[in-house]
Every structure is written in structure tokens, then in C-alpha cells.
Amino acid sequence: SNGFFYGTNKVQASNLFFSVYTSAYLDPKFTLATRIYNDGSSLREIISNINQRFTLFLPSDTVLRGLGYDYDISRSEWRYVSPINGAVTTGSIARSRLLRILYNCIVSTPEGEMNNLSGSGVIRSGEMDLPGEYIKWNNNKVYGAGNEVLGNAANIIGHEDQQNGRTYYVDNLIEFSEESPGVDLKNLAAPVGSEFFNFYSYLKNSSLYNVTGDKIEGVDLGTSYTFVIPNNAAIVKAVKAGVLPGNVTTGVPNFNPSLQGEKDLVADFIRYHILATKTVSDDGLLGGQFETLRKDSKGEKTYVSVLSDTGVLTFIDKAKKSANYIPSNSNHLADRTLIHLVDNYLLYTE
């Protein structure tokens, strides 16, 4: 005899064969996703962790190639051809683009929050310590901000349960938006009677707004923000308080003031309603004090406090005045951004 032999009554659970990563790794229809999971992106390490639960949205090679993504083995590089204009991107830029999309297809779901997609909801993608972007679902269709721009969705065409979560097979990508959040705000304000109309009307006439591309000064593509938009009644309230230009008696706004001092009031008001570098929602994931785009008279940062819990989202200004989100008209997706409608305005005082 040269050793001992022990029998077991349970197979050792390997991360590679019992996790949502397995759904891609063991199926030749998903070689492109598997390649980027394994190329040092850290995605494999995330989704193969059987001690945490995830939901994975998995596009096949056919889906990826149909939307312009492929890997050139002869050149050892990723390649992307835009389905819209045929523009070709290769190398690290193409890889980064696909990596962003596939990271938004990974969602930390410790309580199985996405096991039933027949209803509707919004959730943050990525793992808990490295947030992705917010995505939505409705009646077994999943959307990113880019899908809303393109007018499509990723449909669920099947699923597979693993030890650490569920894999959904999808017929489209969960796309990110390449438009300025100003475009999304403009679209929200467009319908007759829109509650975003008053705020947007001040914005589009302000020094912060560039009609070419609907760009907002200080708001850069690819950076996280939260837009806190007072509804029409809150804007009227701000006018009556002299916080915004208009008739202080009737509350009728003057969206395009001629005096420089009033123009500055508008610009500062708008900046204070945009949280910089953070995206917050009514999910309890982020709370505390967050920087806004506004600077004080000394050029220092200003802050707004955020209270967040399941179904709760409140913004509090320096004077301790609060603005509560309006659930039916909040959590609108934009580029790494959420746009919320609130029932009050925020005011910075020095």
C-alpha cells in the first residue's frame, strides 16, 4: 500500500462549475463573453464567487457579433463596428466599451431580487463595492439608459439557476447611453404638462446650457451624477421666495432674465440640484453628504445630504429643508445618471 483512499458523499463545489460564470464557461455559444471574463477584467472572479449571489445577463456570440462586437484572433484585439454609422473601433477602446456593457449585465442580488422579472423595477448593476450603472426591468424586458435612447430592450429568452444566483439569456445587450443627460431631461420636459418643464426652461436659457448636443456645463459623459429636479409647483414656490427670477407675487417664472445677477441665481440654483460623482436611488445603497456642482463664494465645494432606504429618497439642503422624491416620476435613466423629480427646491445659504 502506498497511501490512503477516502470516500465522500458530496462533490467539492468548484467556483468554475457551480457559479453563474459556469453558464458561459461551459457553453461554446458564449466564447466572446467568456474571453473578456477571463482576460484580467476581474469579471470572472466576481461572478464565480459562490459565497455571493448574482444575477447575470448573458448575450451569446451571435448577439454580440450582430451588434458589432468581435475578437480578432490574428491581431489579438477586440473590434467594434457601430451598427448605426459603421465606424470601426479596435483595441483597448473597443474592449472598454464591451467591458462596460458586460459589467452592467452583472447585478449583485443577495436576496434574489431579480428572480422574477414579470413586474418592474430599477436596480444598480455591478458588485456592492464597485457600483455599475442603474438598469430597469419591465415584463421580462431589461433596459439600460442606451436601450431607452435606441427604443429597444434586452428580452429574456431563458434562464439557468446556479449555486450563486441566476443566469438570464438575452437577445440584446443592456446598452449604456452616449447622450448627454441634458437630452434625457429635455425629453422628460417635452410632453404637455410635464412636471420637469419649469426647471428645464430655466436650464435651457441659462449660461450652463449648450443647445449643441444639449450639454450642461460641468456634466461630463461617463461620470456619475444625480439630478434632483423640483417639480413645477416647487419652482413657483422658489420664484415667490425670490430664489429664482420671476413675479414674486404670482410666482410666474422669468425663464430668460436679462440681468446678470439673475442669470447667476439661475446657474447656481441648477448647479446645487446636481450631485457630482454619485448616483443615488431609493434603495438604501448610498446615503450621507454628497458634493454638488455648485461652489460657494470662496470656490469651495457645497453639499446636499441624502437619506435613502427602500422606497425612501430625501434630499436635505444646508438649511435642513428637505425635498422628497416623487416615486412615479423618478429613477429616470441617463448616462451613469438618475434623474429624480422632487416636491421641493433646495437652497444653499452661506
Please give the residue ranges for each predicted region.
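Mature, structured domains of secreted/extracytosolic soluble proteins
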Residues: 1-350
